[in-house]
Amino acid sequence: MQILPIVISLITILFLIASILFFSKIKLGIIQIDTFWIVTMIGAIVLIVCRCVSIQDLKESFFSRTSVNPIKILVLFLSLSSLSIYLDELGMFSHLATFFANRFSKNQYVLFFGFYAMISLLTIFTSNDIIILTFTPFLCVFCKENRINPLPYLMMEFVAANTWSSILIIGNPTNIYLSSFYNLDFMTYFMSMAIPTISASITGLLILFLIFHKSLKEPLQHKYEKENKIKKIPLVFGLLHLVGCTVLLSVSSYLNLPMWLIAMAFSLSLMLFVILYSAAEKENQIVPLLKRLPWNLIPFVLSMFVLVLALKNSGLTQILSQTFESWDQVITFGYSGLLCANLINNIPMAVLYSSLLEHASLKAVYASILASNIAAYITPIGALAGIMFMNLTEKHDVKISFVTFVKYGLLIGLPSATAGFLALRFLP
């Protein structure tokens, strides 16, 4: 077993954790840059320079014609993100939130469970990151204006978005990444993950209610909010693209079309519509849309892929894989996935586990996917969504400390994950 690639990878991961906790952004004039991808990119470059990964290895991995090509996976994720971000740019999600709050604010119980249902439904067909970015500011402002405790609603939002994101392949980049490695089609994935996701979600909701039911008893005097108007033509086109893409993805295996190609086609079609509509209306809708795409995931995922290649070449992943496969695979990969994601973040965890799962059972793959989603609400390190969530709450003067987040995360996350793993373990 080679030691150098393990040492370099370990140092990179330690600096990654430090960057997430202590210096998540750096300022260059008026521009703020995330540091997480810079750290991993430096680590990847060092590994290449030290010849822990050969150029031939990179060519074979990045330009392979299989579905495990990381570039194809990134195209799939960015394309799907563009469809959701466009609807958010139009104001659809904030409109729905305001509409719901104005009509169902009779008491906090109705509001709490109603928001949970809406956030869960929207997460299933869009993306957990988009929901977090949209609903966190809304809930902070809503709770402040109505003088109610924001913590139950914010924790509910985060738990709902990061549990229901497991049910469809499009809900999280980790779902896309791991399922692509094992050629799982849309419907096969859904049929296998539906019951574990529902089990985890029901468990999480019950625990949320037990923790916060006293706070929800407080009276609510809702202040009516004006609902923003949405232009109908862009909204219709945006929804048609999202629904059409989701439907075609669900039957992609029968059409013998790769999912990344379907998503890219819908994304390019939407971009063309936005450009033409913007020109006709003398507006600029394309630039805000392009700015909000998570471009920093490209160097991050590719760099982590280099780290995993180096660890694979060192022989470490083979040793770990053989060790994990000798035990109960659902439990081993599930709980180790939770721990790993909260040490190095869920995207690097997914990249690492793609190597560990090479000879594992399909249930182990699904357990790893479920872990990569639920890990997000155990600690803020577990996912990029956690970092965004903490930054957004701080900007809106809602204080949720790291310790508070972890306390509720462990209380809710571990039982939810256990329910999901057990459902997966005993399913035929």
Language-model-detected regions and their locations in the chain:
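Residue-level recognition of transmembrane alpha-helices
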Residues: 116, 137, 158, 171, ...
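Membrane-core helix-loop-helix motifs of multi-pass transport proteins
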Residues: 1, 146-214, 219-230, 236, ...
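Hydrophobic transmembrane alpha-helices of multi-pass small-molecule transporters
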Residues: 1-85, 195-201, 205-313, 408-428
